[in-house]
Amino acid sequence: MSETSRDALRERALKLDATDPLAGRRELFALDDGVYLDGNSLGALPVHVPARVQDVLTRQWGELRIRSWDESGWWTAPERIGDRIAPLVGAAAGQIVVGDSTSVNVFKAVVAAARIAGEGRDEILVDATTFPTDGYIAASAARLTGHRLVPTDPADVPAALGPRTAVVLLNHVDYRSGRLHDLPGLTAAVHAAGAVAVWDLCHSAGALPVGLDEHGVDLAVGCTYKYLNGGPGSPAYLYVAERHQAAFDSPLPGWNSHADPFGMTPGYAPADGSVRGRVGTPDIVSMLTLEAALDVWDGVAVDTVRAKSLALTDFFLECVEAYVPAGRVASVTPAAHAERGSQVALRCDEAEPVMRRLIERGVVGDLRRPDVLRFGFTPLYVGFADAERAARVLAEVLAEIPPSGPAA
């Protein structure tokens, strides 16, 4: 490729950054001079969070101690923070509770969904290409409830549905390829079959509109350490549509979800509303870290984030095509906007050494064995110059590593 063409792409990147309505958000994050394209695995640290966490440790815990459960709002944090997440996934207040891990929330959601579905339905459909933990948990839930697990490709779900289908567990965005699945259409198909839809939003929340209420989703789960920037191991969340809350029967009925948690009665009586999704004492330090991190979303429209995400991934793919010799990489991320999340996955036979050298040169992505390079584009802090630089460095690295086989 000529230097003139490279200069043209660099100039375009600078112009795009200059007109980016989200460009100012980058300064809200602790970033170095490198290119961070792994926000689909762990989001960057918002710069104001350490001071907020210090207050939690020194004043709320250190000085107020037990009083902070009331005076600092610790007890109500799971629902309060859930209401902060709600508009980011298209949900009204009162339907999301924060706490536990994604795996635990998947278990709660799938078992509760099977119970909502009722008698006569004994199959749980699960995305056959799912992130492994969802498959493990769904299999355990099936054993516990006496259901049969049916792994199914998302494209085949409508044909696989039937009168025995109780629950369908799907990923909104595929963690490996970045494919965006048809949440509205698949949810409608699940409902038409009389089943309950459970969605995993780990790779979509904070990257694109979800529309939980608009599309009638029954239950959903998601993590908060990717595009929501809640920090390593930050608590996950559980969405229970208001219409299902009275029937939500958690398989983990802990004291925190009791109607009178301090009554200490031997019998369990569930609380009303989203509180039913709680289990035990919340992880307050991680939870309040997440609450502070969510401040970066103030004044940001998810539609604006989505528009930039698509523009970034389009531009990155254009730069890869321009810089990288044919045959070295092949995109496994759909080109169609309606089918693309906020990452680009490139198949590359030399994925491990390539990613290692990219990171050494300041371009941080990750890989999924054996041969997929993943580049996550977090619109709040990734710019177009980052996309151009990442593609350029990728080409330089590939020029140094002999090909070992076809990429496609």
Predicted regions and their residues:
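Pyridoxal 5′-phosphate
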Residues: 1-408
